[in-house]
Curated annotation (Swiss-Prot):
GO terms for cellular component: cytosol. InterPro entries: Trm112-like (IPR005651). It comes from the Bacteria. It comes from Shewanella pealeana (strain ATCC 700345 / ANG-SQ1). It holds the Pfam family Trm112p. This is UPF0434 protein Spea_1772. Belongs to the UPF0434 family. SUPFAM superfamilies: Trm112p-like (SSF158997). Disulfide bonds: none annotated.
Length: 57
C-alpha cells in the first residue's frame, strides 16, 4: 500500500506539532525541526516518538 500524500495536510510531528515532509526513498516522514524520521509501514505512518529515528547531522 502506498503512502497517501494528502495525509501531509493533516498529520503533524507528535513532538513539536510542526510540518512533516515525505521521504519517498526511505519511506519516512521527516520533521526537520526536531531532526526525527518517522517510519511508514504498509502506507501507514507510525507517529510515535519512541519509533522515530534521529536524522544524521
Amino acid at each position: 500500500m502506498a503512502f497517501d500524500k494528502k495525509l501531509l495536510e493533516i498529520v503533524a510531528c507528535p513532538v513539536c506539532k510542526g510540518k512533516l515532509e515525505f521521504n519517498k526513498e526511505a519511506q519516512q516522514l521527516i520533521c526537520k525541526a526536531d531532526k526525527l524520521a518517522y517510519p511508514i509501514n504498509d502506507g501507514i505512518p507510525v507517529l510515535l516518538e519512541n519509533k522515530a529515528e534521529p536524522l544524521a547531522e
